[in-house]
Structure formats: C-alpha cells, structure tokens
Design a protein with these regions (language model features):
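Interfacial loop-to-transmembrane junctions
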Residues: 230-253
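Hydrophobic transmembrane alpha-helical segments of multi-pass transport and channel proteins
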Residues: 212-220, 247-255
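Membrane-embedded alpha-helical bundles of polytopic integral membrane proteins
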Residues: 2-212
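Juxtamembrane boundary at the C-terminal end of a transmembrane helix
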Residues: 262-269
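Short helical (or helix-break) motifs at transmembrane helix termini and adjacent helical loops
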Residues: 144-155, 218-230
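Re-entrant/interfacial helical elements at transmembrane boundaries that shape
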Residues: 155-156, 227-233, 255, 259-260
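Residue-level recognition of oxygen-bearing side chains
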Residues: 167, 171, 246, 259
Length: 269
C-alpha cells in the first residue's frame, strides 16, 4: 500500500511540474479536467444523480465550463456572472423537471461548481500572477507539504486528538507540526528559488507566513472532505489515483488552500 501511494505521489508531482511550469493552456486544460472529474466524484457521493448522467449533473458541468472559459479568455470580470449563470442553469433543470429532483440535490449541484471548479481554478489564477510559477509552489507546500509534516509529527508525538469523532488519527501535535513544517518548507523554498525569483517582497519570512496560514486552512479543507465522506458513509470519493482514492481525496486540502494563497500573495507580496 505504501509503495503504491509513493509511486502515485511521484506521478502526481511529475504531472504537477509538467503543467505548472509551462502554465497557460496546458495548466488550464489539466485543471478543467481535474475539476470536472472532482465534480463527478462529489455528485456521486452526494447522490445528485441516482443513475447515469442526468440533466442536473450536466447543468453543473456546463456552469463549470462556462466559468473556466471566462478565465481562458482573460475575462475575469465575467466570472461572477458565469457562477450566477451556473445557478440559473441548475435551477432551470430543477423547475422544468419538477419533481424529479429534491432541493438538497440542487444545493449539492451548485456546491460542486463552487467547491470544486471555482476553488481549484485559483491554482490557474495564482500561476498567472507575477512570479506565479513560483507562487503556485506555496499552494502545494501548504497542503501536501503540511500534510506530510503533520503525519510524521503525529506519528512520533501525537497524543491529543484534534477531531476525535471525525478523524481519530489526527492529533493537535500533528497539526502544530504541519503548520510549523509548512512554514519551514516555505522559508527554505524562498531561499532555494531566490536566484530565479528576484521579485521584491518574496522573502523567506513572507513565504513562511503565507505557508503557515495556508497550512491552517488546508486542515479545514482536509477535515471538511472527511466530514462529507462520513456523512455519506463512503471511504473514498473514487479510485482514479491508486493508493489515494479519487481526485477529491488527493486535492481536498488543495481546494481550500489555493484561493487563500492567491489572495495572500496579492496582499502581502
């Protein structure tokens, strides 16, 4: 199991580098595909569609695609309109097929657009910032890096449960280790890339601060995804990534972290 997780993790890192470094259309298409797969996993878990692919799911996917097109065409001022249009599409399916769908399915369909597609899109938006190729790294340090540090510290000295009912294996000590580890990794990252990233303000201290805040947010994202799985009585969202589960199982913390790293980078750097 560990070997499978490790190999899958290496493949994910290679894919991340191969899409983030060139950015542009390569990253856009990759994120759009990941978002749609993640939405499908969430819709299945939340029973938006009982069997097959129905109108409600298609409305959610269409809304996500329209939102992503505003980013591709560099028309970010229309992104809010795109999100509202997604809501109109979903509500249209609801009213014109009534009583096929229930209100909770409608809310889940719209939740999928925002929770998965919109929030993941901030990886692309961060990449498009000045020095964005380097800033995207902070998203993954704050999520995957923090998670690894939290796991190691928790295994070594974890005693006090962070969320005993929801996630019994997570400890307060592990959480602290995750935040501290992310801050340290962020600082080291700044030192390593300074030769290629001379932008003012991109100091080790700032990167450490951003990664520490991002790590705190990533814990919420991780636990939130776990809470949904517990509510729906499923172990994983999917089986796409061997040893990890589905897209949402691997990107649960990234989903929450990406928007905050984007805004922190805009404010602090």
């Amino acid at each position: 199991m560990f070997k499978t997780r490790l190999l899958s993790g290496i493949v994910l890192i290679i894919i991340a580098l191969a899409t983030i470094i060139p950015g542009g259309i390569v990253l856009f298409v990759t994120l759009a595909a990941i978002s749609l797969i993640g939405m499908q996993e969430l819709y299945k878990a939340m029973k938006v569609q009982e069997k097959g692919v129905g109108g409600l799911e298609l409305a959610g996917y269409a809304g996500a695609v329209i939102y992503y097109l505003t980013l591709l065409l560099d028309k970010e001022e229309f992104s809010l309109i795109a999100i509202l249009f997604a809501l109109v599409l979903i509500m249209s399916v609801y009213v014109f097929t009534y009583p096929k769908y229930h209100a909770d399915q409608i809310m889940a369909a719209m939740f999928g657009v925002i929770y998965v597609a919109v929030m993941l899109s901030y990886i692309y938006k961060t990449r498009n910032l000045e020095s964005g190729a380097w800033l995207v790294g902070l998203i993954f340090i704050s999520s995957w890096g923090s998670d690894t540090c939290a796991y190691c510290v928790g295994m070594l000295i974890g005693k006090h449960k962070m969320a005993p009912v929801l996630s019994p294996k997570k400890s307060v000590e592990g959480g602290i280790g995750g935040v501290a580890g992310a801050a340290l990794l962020g600082a080291l990252y700044a030192v390593v890339i300074v030769k290629w990233n001379p932008a003012s303000g991109h100091t080790a201290l700032m990167y450490a601060l951003i990664c520490a805040v991002g790590a705190l947010i990533s814990m919420v994202g991780d636990l939130a995804a776990s809470a949904i799985k517990r509510n729906k009585e499923i172990k994983d969202y999917g089986r796409l990534i061997p040893g990890h589960g589905g897209i949402l199982d691997r990107f649960d913390s990234v989903i929450f972290t990406a928007p905050f790293i984007y805004f922190l980078a805009n404010v602090l750097l």
